[in-house]
Amino acid sequence: MTAAREAIRMRAFDAFKADLEAVPPITLRGGDALDSYDEPPPYDAAIDEPTDRYLETFAFNGLNFLDAASWRHYLPRLIDYALRHIASNAPGTMAIDGLLWSLRPPDRDPPRLASLTREQEEAVVAALEQLAFSDDSVYRTDAMQVMEEWWIPGALYRPPC
C-alpha cells in the first residue's frame, strides 16, 4: 500500500473511532440475512469479525440493510479493504462495489450520508479520490460517478447547505 493510501486508511480509522468501538445494531451478516428475508442474527464477536473474507461474503448484499450507526461502523473497514484491493476486480472484491453503492444518493430517512461528521466526510472523499483518480484503480468510473452525485462541491443530488 502506498504511503498516501496508508494515510487515508489511518485517517478513516481515526474519524470513525467511536463508531468502530460500538457494537453495530445490525451486522453485515445480519443485513445479508435481511436480504434473504430472514431474521438478522445477533452480533457475535467471533463470527462478525470484519476480516477480508467476512467483507467479501456479506458487504455487497448486507450494506443496503444497515442503519446509519451500523453503516458508519463498517465504513473505515471497507475503505481499508478498497484501498488494499484498488487494482483488483476479482469476484470477492464486490465488497468495493457495495461500498461505492452505499455512498450514492438518494440518502435515506433517517439519513446515512448526512449522518457523517465533517472529518468522516473528508476521509470518505479522500478514499473516493484514490479510487477515482489512481492509475491502478479499476473503480475509476464508478468512483467518479459517486463523487459527482454527492461528494464534490455542487454535487448533482446533494441538497445545498
PLM features: residue spans?
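Long, low-complexity, highly charged intrinsically disordered regions
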Residues: M1-G62
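Extended alpha-helical scaffolding segments
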Residues: L66, W71-C161
